[in-house]
């Protein structure tokens, strides 16, 4: 959980209203640790975890030292609540209708801390607004995280290409030259992100040094930009190929068990 709540990113609003700032921060120090209160988002998979990392990936003002806390806390820490969104699989009645969400889920959680005690041995950064963010960018941390984002996009691109191919095949549209050209374009773009991901690995950097290496950051950020610019276009192509076919489907597969139908 490394982001403050969206509505709490301007502390001046709360100060003018004489209201407590909801962003997670240190409320006091004690001999054996610190006490934190407030909210942080979004801890992906926190409900399945044992420990949660708390930090700051957005820049903090120099006077926001108390919000600069970086630490880890157990998920059963007294005073900690996890506000999780509704799991997707709760609405999946069958594997056929929802093949992905029937098997998997990705549940993000809001962290709400109410006087949570953090021992000093679990505190990594305290009262240093600049270092609180720099630990991600002055080390390979951000490179590993963003490379993983590229790999996720590659997997998603493979899924999209497969879906487009299945949709076109089911409707017979794959025999139309223009549609075949679109499928070829999508396949070529899947190969492109594959090349970008492998390039980051094969053209690795000798950084931070001393025998350690890192993914090629220049190629990594180029891939992130490419993914951002092209994703909506690929989704639009899938929608175009689907056409009105999705409206021909019944509410769920249970109708196939009706003898009269």
Language model regions located:
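FAD-binding core of flavoproteins
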Residues: 5-149
């Amino acid at each position: 959980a490394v982001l403050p709540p969206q509505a709490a990113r301007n502390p001046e609003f709360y100060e003018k209203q004489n209201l407590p700032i909801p962003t997670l921060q240190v409320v006091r120090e004690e001999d054996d640790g610190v006490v934190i209160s407030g909210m942080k988002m979004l801890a992906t998979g926190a409900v399945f975890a044992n420990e949660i990392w708390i930090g700051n990936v957005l820049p903090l003002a120099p006077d926001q030292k108390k919000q600069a806390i970086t630490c880890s806390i157990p998920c059963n820490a007294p005073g900690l609540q996890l506000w999780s969104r509704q799991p997707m699989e709760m609405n999946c009645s069958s594997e056929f209708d929802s093949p992905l969400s029937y098997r998997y889920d990705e549940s993000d959680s809001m962290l709400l801390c109410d006087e949570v005690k953090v021992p000093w041995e679990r505190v990594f950064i305290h009262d240093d607004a600049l270092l609180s963010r720099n630990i991600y960018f002055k080390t390979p941390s951000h490179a590993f995280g963003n490379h993983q984002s590229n790999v996720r996009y590659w997997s998603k691109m493979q899924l999209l290409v497969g879906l487009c191919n299945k949709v076109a095949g089911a409707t017979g549209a794959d025999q139309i030259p223009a549609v075949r050209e679109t499928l070829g374009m999508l396949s070529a773009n899947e190969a492109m992100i594959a090349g970008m991901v492998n390039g980051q690995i094969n053209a690795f950097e000798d950084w931070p040094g001393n025998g350690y290496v890192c993914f090629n950051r220049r190629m990594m950020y180029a891939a992130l930009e490419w993914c951002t610019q092209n994703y909506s276009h690929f989704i639009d192509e899938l929608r175009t190929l689907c056409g009105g076919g999705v409206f021909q489907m019944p509410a769920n597969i249970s109708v196939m068990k009706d003898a009269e139908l």
